[in-house]
A protein has these predicted regions:
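Conserved "HGTGT" condensation-loop signature of ketosynthase/thiolase-family condensing enzymes
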Residues: 1-107, 133
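Acyl-thioester C-C bond-transforming condensing/cleaving domain
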Residues: 36-39, 79, 95, 99-106, ...
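Short acidic/histidine-centered micro-motifs embedded in hydrophobic/aromatic stretches
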Residues: 51, 114, 171
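Proline- and acidic/polar-enriched loop/turn elements at helix boundaries
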Residues: 61, 110, 140-142
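Short glycine-rich or small-residue beta-strand-to-loop segments that form or flank ligand, phosphate
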Residues: 109-116
Length: 179
């Protein structure tokens, strides 16, 4: 498990959201008054925790998330010739997994990268991971929405059970942060 260095507490998130909501409501006071728009409600850290069970979340890129004029991360574009952000995350996780499993990249028969979405369709993140680590087996990406990690684990289990692989590296490099 690799965890990004940035975290955002409910208090930070709610402070940014409430500032955004107050600004929105002030800028659209006339439309809200006439019923054309609905007022943005304020929130609390307690509500977020009760509704989601989340007290803090990790973010790959914190910049922009708490900016009330943006409210989403600023993830710099990378060219197709550069390692993708998701591949960078996957490599961080892969290196930790290999070390904890006492495995060398040469022992990996397959790399499965499974997530809700990918930043780009080519090259596959699994291929980027293979190239960076020197893995000679096969690899592919799976896009399976919210349950992506469990689908990757199931596919890895099936490969090992069928004898088509002895060692599978399954990675779930999500860029999104819920709530």
């Amino acid at each position: 498990l690799w965890t990004p260095e940035h975290s955002i507490s409910n208090e930070e998130l709610v402070a940014a959201y409430n500032a955004y909501a107050e600004k929105y409501n002030a800028e659209h006071a006339g439309e809200i008054e006439s019923g054309e728009l609905t007022e943005k409600p304020l929130s609390s850290a307690e509500f977020v925790a009760k509704a989601s069970g989340i007290h803090s979340r990790f973010a790959y890129c914190k910049d922009g998330i708490l900016d009330i004029d943006r409210m989403r991360p600023r993830i710099p574009e990378r060219s197709d010739n550069e390692l993708s952000h998701q591949a960078e995350m996957a490599l961080n996780a892969a290196r930790i997994a290999l070390k904890e499993a006492n495995k060398d990249p040469g022992e990996i028969d397959a790399v499965i990268v499974s997530c809700a979405y990918t930043q780009r369709s080519y090259p596959a993140i699994a291929i980027e991971v293979q190239n960076e680590l020197g893995i000679e087996g096969f690899g592919f990406d799976m896009l399976v929405a919210c349950s992506a990690a469990t689908f990757a684990l199931q596919r890895a289990y099936e490969m090992i059970s069928a004898g088509t692989a002895k060692c599978v590296l399954a990675i779930n490099p999500e860029l999104t942060s819920p709530q």
